[in-house]
Amino acid sequence: MAQPASPRGVGLVGPSTLLIRFLSFCITENHPDVMTNPLPDALLSYARRTVVVTGAATGMGAETVALLLETGAEVHALDIAEVTTPVTSAQHVDLGDPASIDGVLDDLPPRIDALMHCAGIPGGTRFDPRTVVRVNFLGLRHLTEAVFDRMGDDASITSIASLAGGGWPGHRTEIFELLATDDFVAGDAWLDGRDDLVGDGYSFSKECVQFWTMWRSTSAIRSGVRVNAICPGVTDTKIMVDFRQAMGDAAIDMTADAGIGRLASPTEMAPAMLFLGHHQAASYINGVNLDIDGGFMAALTTGQVDFSKYNLGS
């Protein structure tokens, strides 16, 4: 089967792929015996792997799709926006509507090697809190359970959570209750009367994604499916304006400055999605929420953030 054309050029030529090639060269140059080990090939290829990606049209999802195509994957894209990348199939879906999700199931492949949840919407003024939770968590869960039987040994589910979801320990009991609901509709009904818990929807929805990742990983691995998530820090996507409105410039700037000193790029998130989703490179990684924040949480945890530099009340 001919490989799809890469949006970054022809074949395996993207910057992330070149980095992986270089690392593999260094490994084999210094340790020739590793040539008998499958790891170098594992780092280079998604060939013959079928991957479903939500939120594939823009931002981190689009970068994930681009890198998957560079590494040989068969990509099936889902998004409410038009997907222009040359994927195997692209379906319009609203993850905030279970009927919309159910409507595309017949168009998805019978076997799915990796499911990558990249769709998400911000809190703030553009979306009401219930819609945010529906899209960011309830839809994610609904799609996962709807296609789970199509996944088997060596399959993976990888989601984009957020550093903003790190408050889940304070809401463990409530999140357990939400996870106990049977389906999308029951989960949505559970939100009734819990406006204080839900807030603007974003942090709570990402708390749910983080906790669900750990919770679902234990049962999923019995079927050979690993479940992980990445937790990006402040990332320069088109919804950054929403985060600045919701959190304030000072909080965004502090999160960026305390680590590497700049916002992340969506291109810096895609390689982590591919790594965690890979059946060989990450074969023993399960139930992990991986912070990708330029070192912000390390600085915060060790008391190295100078809060006095920022007017966090503004």
Which residues make up each language-model segment?
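Flexible N-terminal pre-Rossmann segment of NAD(P)-dependent oxidoreductases
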Residues: L23, I27-T50
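Canonical Rossmann dinucleotide-binding motif of NAD(H)/NADP(H)-dependent dehydrogenases/reductases
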Residues: P40-V75
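Rossmann-fold cofactor-recognition segment
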Residues: P86-A99
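Catalytic loop of short-chain dehydrogenase/reductase
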Residues: I121-T125, D153-R222, V234
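Short, small/polar-rich loop/turn modules that mediate ligand/substrate recognition or access, typified
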Residues: R226, I285-G287
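Short, flexible catalytic-loop segment of classical short-chain dehydrogenase/reductase
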Residues: C231-D242, A298
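A conserved structural motif in NAD(P)-dependent oxidoreductases
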Residues: A258-M269
